[in-house]
From Swiss-Prot:
Transmembrane segments: none
Reaction(s) this enzyme catalyzes, per UniProt: a 2'-deoxyribonucleoside 5'-diphosphate + [thioredoxin]-disulfide + H2O = a ribonucleoside 5'-diphosphate + [thioredoxin]-dithiol
Superkingdom as given in the UniProt entry: Bacteria
InterPro entries the UniProt entry points to: RdRp_reductase_class-2, RNR_2_N, RNR_lg_C, RNR_NrdJ/NrdZ, TSCPD_dom
Active site (UniProt): N420, C422, E424
Needed co-factor(s): adenosylcob(III)alamin
Record carries keyword Transmembrane: no
Function: Catalyzes the reduction of ribonucleotides to deoxyribonucleotides. May function to provide a pool of deoxyribonucleotide precursors for DNA repair during oxygen limitation and/or for immediate growth after restoration of oxygen.
Region (Disordered): 909-932, 969-988
UniProt binding sites for substrate: S169, A213, C214, G242, N420, P421, C422, S423, E424, P604, T605, G606, T607, I608
This protein's UniProt keywords: Cobalamin, Cobalt, Disulfide bond, DNA synthesis, Nucleotide-binding, Oxidoreductase
Gene (name only): nrdJ
Source organism of the structure: Rhodopirellula baltica (strain DSM 10527 / NCIMB 13988 / SH1)
Cofactor binding note: 5'-deoxyadenosylcobalamine (coenzyme B12).
The protein's name: Vitamin B12-dependent ribonucleotide reductase
Amino acid sequence: MSTVLPESNATSRIPANDPALEKVDSEHGVEYAREKFGTALRGDRAGLKFESKFCPDDGRTPFATTAWDLRSAAIKDESGNALFEQTDCEVPASWSQLATNVVVSKYFYGDPKNTDERERSVRQLIHRVTRTISDWGLADGYFDTPEDGERFYRDLTWLSLHQHGAFNSPVWFNVGLHAQYDVEGDMCNWHWDRTENTTAQPDNPYEYPQGSACFIQSVDDNMEDIMRLACSEAMLFKFGSGTGTDLSTIRSQREKLSGGGTPSGPLSFMRVYDSIAGVVKSGGKTRRAAKMQSLKVWHPDILEFIECKWAEEKKAHALIREGYDSNFNGEAYASVCFQNANLSVRLTDDYMEAVRKNENFQTRWITDKPTTEPPSYVAKELLNKMAECAWHCGDPGVQYDTTINKWHTCPNSGAINASNPCSEYMFLDDTACNLASINLMKFVQQDGSFDHERFRAACRTFFIAQEILVDHASYPTEPIARNSHKFRPLGLGYSNLGSVIMTAGLPYDSDAARGMCGSLTALLHGEANRTSAELASVVGTFDGYVENEAPMLRVMQMHRDACDQINDDGPAELKEAARELWDGVLEIGEKYGFRNAQATVLAPTGTISFMMDCDTTGIEPDIALVKYKQLAGGGMLKIVNQTVKLGLKTLGYDADTIDEILKYVDANDTIEGAPGLQDEHLAVFDCAFKPANGVRSIGWRAHITMMAAAQPFLSGAISKTVNMPTDVTPQDIADAYFWGWELGLKAIAIYRDGSKQSQPLNTKSDEQKATDAAEAAKVETVEKIVYKPRRERLPDTRQSLTHKFSIAGHEGYLCVGLYPDGRPGEMFITMAKEGSTIGGIMDSFGTALSIAMQYGVPLEVIVNKFSHTRFEPMGHTSNKDIRIAKSVVDYIARWLGITFMSGNDYSPSAEGAAKTGGNGPDLTTAPAGATANNNSPVMAELRADAGAAVALVERATLLASLQNGVSNGSATNGHSNGQSAGGSSDGAVAERAVDGLGGQADQFSRFQTDAPSCDNCGSITVRNGNCYLCHNCGNSMGCS
């Protein structure tokens, strides 16, 4: 969550025209450290010893350990227009252009229009943050000697500079602005005043910068506190932060007020909170605020809570059908409630046992006023209702309340009731958490092994830095400032797990990968807690430790016991290292206690993953094997992920075979069918989304089992939405919710692709599926048909198909003329507003398409080229197979694909997917548009009148597949991998080189049919955790 302190009355003194940026830290050193050195917290106790593990101790500054470039940084929209630009930015030569663009545009301080008052080098940015944190640590007495403090600064700087780790965005936004540049601003937040031993509001908020993005707030069952929460949420949204609250404390609408009246219930106040979030845009931006609202399953209003979002979605759909703007930020959605929050139901073990036994579940009153029994529900039916609503709109998710509190380190101070918006931070009410993430790929060695010793050293360094920030940061409310000091929760995590797994030659969906994930997470959590105990020996435990000592030690023992359950198929040395580490954690923890009540979470690491040039975020697998790399001089280059090459090398392939496989992936966007690749290794390269020319992807169950491998080794939870394909059923979602509880997860959120605009489809019977499979397996004898590049005109009298469409209220008609065998050969496009500009353009577009089809341009080329083209008018349609069209051209192309091509990658229809076995469109075709979807209703109708002609075109299509494509090994489905027999791909290569930005947009639009455009640059986003991430500008629509 982007967190920015107010800019009013802010002044700065950034060093202008510095002639020697390479000496940005030359004024510091051991002598300077001696001046800053203090023992404020530790008194007579010895401080931390710190040995350099990363930055060479050879007299050079950390910034002299890398080469530097001068580059321009720019953020452009999909049309190439610059939204942000800064020239002559100094960045490490090893950083990608995307990392440069993200860091310069988001994290450099100052006015972009005044470069003399703006940071212009990455070394300024990193030095501002790491020097400030180190100085604070020196002054507070964390380090044993000034030399230890200076070594800490050097290592922390080196790790940040070389992309080994990164703090969450608020740290880069705010830390060091006062200490390094004397920036000042108005009083607003709260901090802990160590001198007075209480909370206070600083005169200058930049002196105590806000460093956290994750907040949890409480609410009591009275009007004053309910409105107080509304006010504090508004202030959090103003500063760009996200917040979560459990509303189970608010009495049900079925209960009584103290004066005898009828209460409103939590849902009524949710409408108030939702309205505030919709009006106060997050961080002053146009995106919606990030918030989480939960309700415990035993609350009497639980059914209304479960159904509330879907009930409002149906209103939006009705408005859209009447012509209102269908954009997610448009009039239709703006006029309905509950669109600004994630919703979660808190499930208890007794409820889940009732589901297992198919028993009734009794809710309970919040107060003792009622004399009647509260509502009772069949537990399984209630779970099915959650799944049904999540199937429709993605909410509610679930949080497993009993499991969460079973792993709670501070139960004597209160229960864990809520989470932050992304569900990874779960702790006491009115607390905050600052996050940091380690880039796992930086610790993979040349031989493919993982350097767990250096990984632990990096974890220790960042954890110390996070701890130093706690009392030097400010917080949006007084209770949060007080509790942050009292409990000091931190959230260290990691990123790039998916890349590490692929590099190791392991499928993401494998016991070996889950074993590796468990071991790495155990090492992360173990080192964080070991460091916390080490800090306790120096500066003391957190204030709430004494009353929670026994439960905290019990939880630590649970973590150690879980080490023995790590899957043995993973790397044995990592599992053994985790066991030994946790033995040490228990020993030092029992002796000194712990400095921090919580230590780790797994956040989605959106924007900071780009800063570290990570291929994958958080615990996620890779989204695709092919990426689009931004070039320093502008434009984009299509590249195959380096992890593919590393994975192939680990699997033992020789250099020539690897080169052939990489060429194939580059040409085809998929590794399926690559020459020389063994079938048993295909799963290693499976990604989160199916490639355009492939059929494989990681199943949703694998995402849940990977979460289960990591969960026992985290203080908090995992921010990860389990993405499901369009054709899953509500029962699949209910099964996932129950399975997550059985596996010991703390939370799970489901998002079904297309759920924002799709309706339920009846699944086929087993008999019908068997019939379809048998039909697909039929292979006819074919004859050789030779097509020449000539114009094939339609007969004077021909059949045609007329289709009426409506896009966001703009009506039009498509009339497609057909050859005798059912192929489309011409198209007339008529818009309702005759004579309009768009009408003329569409008429010309129809003529161009007609000529193209008659001269033999394959239909799938036309469909692939024009699908997902984005411009106005766009929005909801009346076609159940194409719920949202990104333009009229997009609608026409996808309608052609659905109607005349086999497969239906162009709509979210589960029925169509079942008809083709889920394998997508057949990408091989005869010339002159010979491909036709002979299973479609249109072709079925035509087949009655032209059976012989249709049989001919079926044979021609199959022949073209055999002649022009290389079989993918499945003789029963007729799909080729799209590789030309002659190996000619020059045209495709040229297209990739000149249309990189369009290619990336097309690639991402295929991942999820209803992914929104970025609110910053307009590019299509990809779902990341509970929010969306833009791979063009690095914007995270909800999380840091």
